[in-house]
Each structure stands twice: as structure tokens, then as C-alpha cells.
Amino acid sequence: MADIYIGAHINREKTIINTMESITKNGGNCLQLFVSNPRSSSIGNIENYTNIADDIRKYATTRDFKIIIHSSYTINLARDFKNGKRAVPINECHWIQLLIHELTISHLIGSVGVVVHVGKHTTQSPEYGLENMRIAIAYIIETLQKNDIKTKIILETPAGQGTELLPNLNDFLAFYNEFSSDQQKYLGICLDTAHVWGAGYDICEAYQMICNKNASDLIVVHLNNSKVAKGSNVDRHATLFDSTGTIPYDSIKKFIKLCNEKKQEQEQGHPMQTRQSHTRQTKQAKQARKCDAIIILETPLPQYATEIELIKLLA
């Protein structure tokens, strides 16, 4: 197994296998991709993935390669359960069905999970939006359990742009830890460095905060620089080692080393996390859960190949 998985979210080539091969050719061993139109709420034909799932799984297994799916940007976990303006039962809600569709594809192709943004409360109160998120996530997890769909909903740390919920990392982790240990088998965390920077955190501080409480739940890192000032609550990515980026190079270098060190600690059998619940701490002490350190560069070609090599050197 790789010590750390490094890859990118790049435009899809003719096939997913071709895209995976492109990542491999450029020194990476993981890929993030969309399986739905990122700007549309339409649900595609799952047969498109059923027919190629075995080939994707075989490529990933033989080359120790990881796949991550990013959800459609149209999904808002905090919104009401409506189709248009019409309130509907949650099982008929179109955006709920879209996320379940993406999670089903994730299971089919052997993806680790689906990264999804936390919700925006829009015109409702933050409390109302958070309750919608709780209900939505719990319902989707129940659906995954009933249908034996083995994949994860990976919640991404927010920048706090507009009415985006949970920009405070303590609040984000508290919300995550409201879910039971059984529910958390279907959950994970994605740390986006540009987002936490926008939310007001040094990226290494954010990493340590998550590791102190939920290290084995931290599955994916979106490793980006930022175009905006720290604490601006704005989500604007920049190329990782861009000299115009606002996240200092030394912070990025230290962050990469932290990721590698934590992965090595975990492989040596040292529990990486402490839990707030005594019951869960005891269970953790008996059997440390292991996760993969997956770094995704959200950088266009051709820069990502150079960045992969630099990350390997810094790690």
C-alpha cells in the first residue's frame, strides 16, 4: 500500500480508465471526478457505470489507485425537501435522490466516497438549515445501509462564503460527531486548505484540530492555495505553489509533512484520534480504524504533474 495517495481532479478523457492512466503517467495514484453534471441536477443513466465498473475496480486494485467522487454543486444539504417549490416526502426529493445516485456509482466503481459541500441555509435560519442537514444525512445513511451500499458521504470543510454553514471547525466537528459510530461508518471528512484558510485558520492548525478529534475520519485533503486573505470567508482557489497565492509556502510544506507523518503513525498502529465519547474511545483503543491519506490537487493540466512531484519531495 502507498504511504500517501496523491492525485488530481482533472478533466475526464475519453474514458475513466484513460483518465486514471493519465494520472498514473504523471506520477499520481488517485483521481477525483464528477459522475453527474456538476452544474445540473439531472440524474444520469447508472448503466453507463455498471458496464465499466469491473474494469475500473481492476485498474485500481492492480495499481493501488484510489478514486474519489465529487458531488454535483447543485446539492445543498441544508435546503428544504422540495422539488421546485413543492414540498415532497424526503424519499421523493430530487436532490436527495441525486446524491444517493452518486453514492451508488461510488459503490459500483470502488470509489472511497463522495465529497459533498456542507449546506447553505439561504433565507432560513442557520439552525433550520443544520436540522435539514441532520435529517438528510441520516436518511441517506439509512438508505445506504438498507441497500448494502458500501461507500462514504465525505463532508468538506467550508470557507463560510455567503450563508454556508459550519465555517467554525469546532462547530463542524461537533456536528459530525453528533452522528453515531454506526452512522460514521458511512461518513468521512475532506479538509480543503483554501476553504479553512478562508474561514480564518492556518492550514496546519486546521489539520491538527481535525486530527485531535477525528483523525481516522479525515479521508481526503483538497490541497489548494488561495487567492484571498485569511479569514475572508471567500472560496477562491489558486494553484498550489503559485507565488501569488496567499497561503505561505512554509505552511504548505509543513502541512504536507504533517499528512505524511500522520499516515506513518497510523500504519505503525498508533491510534491517531481521540473521541469525545468514552464508549467510542474504548472501541478505538481496541481496534484503531485505518484510513488512507488522499491528497487531491484541484489544479488544471499541465501544472498538476509538477505539483505531484513537489509534494513527493516535500513529504
Show which residues each predicted segment covers.
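Hydrophobic faces of well-ordered beta-strands that scaffold small-molecule active sites
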Residues: 4-10, 29-33, 67-71, 114-116, ...
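Acidic (Asp/Glu)-rich catalytic clusters
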Residues: 21-28, 46-68, 100-110, 140-149, ...
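Active-site beta-loop-alpha junctions enriched in small/polar residues
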Residues: 9-13, 36-38, 72-74, 119-121, ...
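N-terminal pre-domain/capping segments
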Residues: 1-101
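Active-site acidic/histidine proton-transfer and metal-coordination neighborhood
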Residues: 61-62, 77-188, 198
